[in-house]
Design a protein with these regions (language model features):
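Short glycine/proline-enriched coil/turn segments at helix->beta-strand junctions
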Residues: 36-41, 48, 59-62, 121-129, ...
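Acidic/histidine-rich catalytic neighborhood of metal-dependent amide-processing enzymes
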Residues: 101-180, 198, 276
Length: 279
């Protein structure tokens, strides 16, 4: 593989960890080992969510934050979890792209691909916060119980939990970033990166973060496909590009704070006044 941002071995290590809702402990252990290796402050809350902090910001500055969820819906992986074994990852190349899957068990790249991208950014950036939630697939039960005080010095959140190369401009009917952000960066994003669709994501962790913190958020496509099925797979090059987009956005947004009062309009995206930005 010729990946510019993601480390191939880290990719295989993350994707091979079996994890299912309410059985995320093997991935938690992996994350804690990662934190020790890369000198990242790590904490675990009572719910089981994992919080990372790397580096220090100046007075009055804010941390960029990335997030993903640790659980998957692939119940067949319980066999591997109970035996403390790693999944067997199958890699196939087609038209210059590398497809990763786990035959018969479902890969669980929703959202281990997002976890991988967050870890990649942690390796490459000197200052960053990251949070990894449990039980997103059960109704965002982890993010609903997040330690809100931990976000007091966070300026914005980039989530990596949208399928394929789709990005979410809204979640549950509420805008994730303000209009000025899209006016400033949408053209550049379209020029520099592949964004197949902009969507109004129905339900994910950043909906609760938006509601509870008023922080601006964005949900970036994590390169996984056929999610929630045994045939789920991810494309290495698409995950790599998602990591590049994350680095680009953090460079542009910097250590500033972006707040948007949460208003859930719960309307179809096609009826939103902002929709024309994404057509």
């Amino acid at each position: 593989m010729n990946l510019s941002t993601i480390d191939e071995q880290l990719m295989l290590d993350v994707l091979s960890v079996p994890t299912v809702s309410q059985h995320e402990h093997l991935l938690v252990e992996f994350l804690m080992d990662f934190a020790k290796k890369y000198d990242v402050d790590a904490n675990l809350d009572d719910k089981g969510n994992v919080y990372f902090k790397k580096g220090m910001v100046a007075d009055g500055a804010f941390y960029p934050c990335v997030c993903a969820h640790m659980d998957t819906v692939q119940d067949k992986q319980l066999i591997w979890i109970n035996e403390n074994k790693r999944l067997e990852i199958k890699i196939e190349e087609y038209l210059g792209r590398h497809y990763l899957s786990c035959e018969g068990f479902g890969l669980g790249a929703d959202d281990k691909a997002g976890v991988l991208i967050c870890l990649t950014l942690l390796k490459r950036l000197p200052v960053l916060k990251a949070v990894f939630f449990v039980e997103e697939e059960m109704g965002c039960l982890g993010s609903e119980k997040a330690e809100l005080g931990w976000f007091k010095d966070v300026g914005y959140v980039l989530a990596f939990d949208s399928p394929g190369q789709d990005c979410s401009w809204a979640c549950g009917g509420a805008r994730l970033f303000d209009r000025q952000f899209y006016e400033n960066y949408l053209v550049e994003l379209k020029q520099k990166f592949t964004i197949k669709n902009w969507c109004n994501h129905p339900f994910t962790d950043i909906m609760f973060l938006r509601q509870d913190t008023s922080l601006a958020c964005m949900n970036i496509g994590a390169g996984y496909y056929k999610y929630h099925t045994d045939g789920e797979y991810c494309i290495a090059e698409h995950m790599d590009e998602a990591a590049q987009m994350g680095l680009y956005l953090i460079d542009k947004l910097g250590n500033n704070e972006y707040l948007i009062p949460y208003t859930s309009r719960m309307r179809d995206a096609n009826n939103e006044d902002d929709k024309y930005f994404f057509e």
